[in-house]
Amino acid sequence: MSQHTYSLTHAQRRVWFTELLESGTSICNLTACVKFRGNIDLDVLEGALNHSISRNDAIRFQLLEGEELEPRLYLTEYKYTSLEIIDFSNVEMIEIEQWIQEQARIPFKLFNSPLYQFYLLRIHNHEVWLFAKFHHIIMDGISLNVMGNQIIDLYQKMKKQDPLPDQPEPSYLSYIEKESQYLQSSRFAKDRLFWTQTFQNPPEYHSLAGQTSLQKQSTSASRDTITLSPHLGQTIRIFCEEQKINIISLFMASFYICISRITSKKDLAIGTYYGNRGSKAEKEMLGMFVSSLPIRITADPDADFLSFVRRVGREQLSVMRHQRFPYNLLVNELRKEQKDLHNLIGISMQYQPLQWHNADGFDYETALYFSGYTANELSVQIQERTDTGTIQLNFDYQNTLFSLEDIKRIQNHLLTLLENALQHPHSFIKELDMTNKREKQKLLYEFNKTEAVSPEAPTLHGLFERQAAVTPERPAIRFSGGSLTYAELDMYAGRLAVHLAARGVTRESIVGVLSKRSPEMLIAVLAVLKAGGAYLPLDPAYPKERLSYMLKDSGAALLLAQPGCSAPNFSGETLEVDMASLASEKAENDVFTPADGCSLAYVIYTSGSTGKPKGVAVEHRQAVSFLTGMQRQFPLQEDDIVMVKTSFSFDASVWQLFWWSLSGASAYLLPPGWEKDPALIVQAIHQESITTAHFIPAMLNSFLDQAEIERLSDGTSLKRVFAGGEPLAPHTAARFAPLLPQVSLIHGYGPTEATVDAAFYVLDPERDRDRLRIPIGKPVPGARLYVLDAHLAVQPCGVAGELYIAGAGVARGYLNRPALTEERFLEDPFYPGERIYKTGDLARWIPEGHIEFLGRLDDQVKIRGYRIEPGEIEAALRSIEGVREAAVTVRTDSGEPELCAYTEGLRRNEVRTQLERLLPSYMIPAHMIEMERWPVTPSGKLDRNALPAPGGAADAETYTAPRNVTEMKLAQLWEDVLKNGPVGI
């Protein structure tokens, strides 16, 4: 006779899908102990257990392997269960708990086998525990308590020899039938409408885990438990009683606020669990009923806390009225419109009341145990002991996403915010702090503790002049075809400065310097400074229109030009810098208007959001402080030689032009054009014994290729390489160490507005091996770094916020842009009288006291309804082994915004395959373009505007950008002919 089988309910189906995804694990195990204290008759207890098993069909369900992926249920006949007694009376409690945890982690045999297991544990003479383990497909947490109460009731009746109930308990089969009817009912249609309207535009899923490593997500989990202080527990209970709110509403509201701040998102969903037992019979029934459902809340920072708690409570009640609707059907409904929909629930919270109950001659309670797995990245259980008043929080967390330290921080954030909210329940949410005083102290002061800087001179040229007086005959600069000593360079600059002073250059005068990399360039810069003025660097490679704009906008009346360079349409005076003429001049007494530390030193133009570049005005004291701090952190010696290879229109040139002069070291001026050719750079390093160089990350990869070819590590003079201008990819950093093991790699970060670099990070191959992002490090001496929220409140460690820079390096402001200066240069809220610079960069502190750069705040885009940070995709791309460099942009060539990824070093199909393992599908770029050479701006940064559009050759083959004017013209001609996207070389 064939066996009758039944379909899984939707609640059971969710469990089964979890089992399929995590097969061979204990993720679906439900383990508990009913703990008895008193004189317990073990034979009677065994009889009570068996009577309960016989009367509840849900326990006796087994699984039959189906033809499809989904199994069928069938009901087995009752068989008496003899309890094995394990004696733990002479064993420490920690060993007992360990044994239980080990049992909890043993998975069940799934098919044609009992899905329950029982033992009796003798703890001591007056305490015994009934150990029970079930597969979640036949039992939920409420059922455990129901069964525990049944066993107690049966035990007492058997002890008193009272008649036992002869009717079976309500059957789970009736629930299976009832759910089938519900799915065809008008109630189901109403519930479906509620849920689909609530999540019509679902909130973006943002992980609470601030991943810094390449670990892949796994359901393997750990638990950390905290017990609230008696005072806090009592305060919570009194508050909830007075305000007539539930503890779960209070905790969930507080948790919403924490998550909102950690993820920088207001629209959030947190999962919680509902019994899903509508009738009296269902409340007494054993089986799997529980619904896991998302509660969606918008955390408005301008709402007051108490009102927000009440709103959370109303949402909980609203969800409760529609709890029967299966969660898996909700996700399926939403995926009809959004195929890329991520899981709605990543974080969950639930409330569990616990207590010891009194019975005739004994006490008892039911305790649940952790399986070692969790389907959510973080699950929080609030356990309140109603007998003692103790409140305990269990944090179950996926340990590939979180460390214990991460969880401790989240706990501290939650409790700090909760305590502040209880003291000030009518405060606006934005006013409630979740960073305690100790953490604030660490973030503001300890992490920003640097060595004090005491410059040897107040001005840039003063530093040089001081060294020229000490080591006049030492070589200051070397270049193709010659060199100049400190005394000679000082002489040339001084003689030119006389001409400048005669033309009215004085303090605050801005003088343009138009020159390729050459001794004339440095002579002109020093001459302007000596005369008291400020230099405006002008790279001849810049478009003429841009040069004209900068000269006009800066108000420069005088232009110093290298022979052969000119600026069309410049209405002021142009003075050619001719070394031969200067050498033949007679020495004159230098009579200049001396600059001081507060005088303007230089103006460097950076890209502006309006399309017009903006001039950043930097004073001597800011530049001198930065250079002094740099020398303190990375001391140069007299035998050091710094390679000057960056365009002096880019702020990284400042340390290349001046740093070496603090110690009597030398600079080597790389011939113009050589900076684009790694072979020539390596040649210069060999021939000139270069010790210090700077690269943007894209060029660093090409340099490493050449270093590998030429075995540069064999006896190289290099001591240190700085990488900056763009985020440094972990793969690039990983390549560096084996190729140049004796050379330090230093990741630098800093906007022009903070005087070159505000932070440095010295890489360590072992420590940084598994990082997802290379940190930008700690502040340079004299600087401070703050990570703040939109209200200038301190963001906790690990939480993203906007990066602000404070300290001695903060520039004067934007030239002739008072409104923009006021917008970006603010009062320092922590050091009265000082200023901070608002970078517009997203960053966070990581536990070891370093800053991690996360991207630009204004780079976020919305693609197909999802808000996406291209920098996050870039970080994932750079983490793929074999990818040397990556960039992600948003293109609208097709009429709709699409993500386009550019990569170097790995075939795009392989990149896509690897990326799909790291990111959800909605973050996978629509286009992948392979690059061999990257277009860069004259300042050496990646020129994102020059990246090729998708389609045609660029999207089909490895793309090499045009490298010079001739190639650009040829490429343009072919593009006009082919009409098929960009043409590479």
Task: Give the label of every model feature segment.
Residues 56, 60, 145-151, 248, ...:
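Extended, hydrophobic beta-loop-alpha segments that form or line the acyl/peptidyl-thioester binding
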Residues 614-643, 651-691:
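Conserved AMP-binding/adenylation subdomain of ANL enzymes
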Residues 1-3, 38-54, 74-112, 152, ...:
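A short, small/polar-residue-rich loop/turn motif at beta-strand boundaries
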Residues 2-76, 91-182, 197, 203-208, ...:
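Acyl-group handoff/entry surfaces in thioester-processing enzymes
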Residues 2-4, 19-30, 57-58, 126-127, ...:
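His-Asp-centered acyl/peptidyl-transfer active-site segments
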Residues 5-20, 41, 93-100, 144-145, ...:
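AMP-binding/adenylate-forming domain of the ANL superfamily
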Residues 326, 340, 358, 388, ...:
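AMP-dependent adenylate-forming
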Residues 662-665, 687-694, 704-771, 775, ...:
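Gly/Ser/Thr-rich phosphate-binding loop
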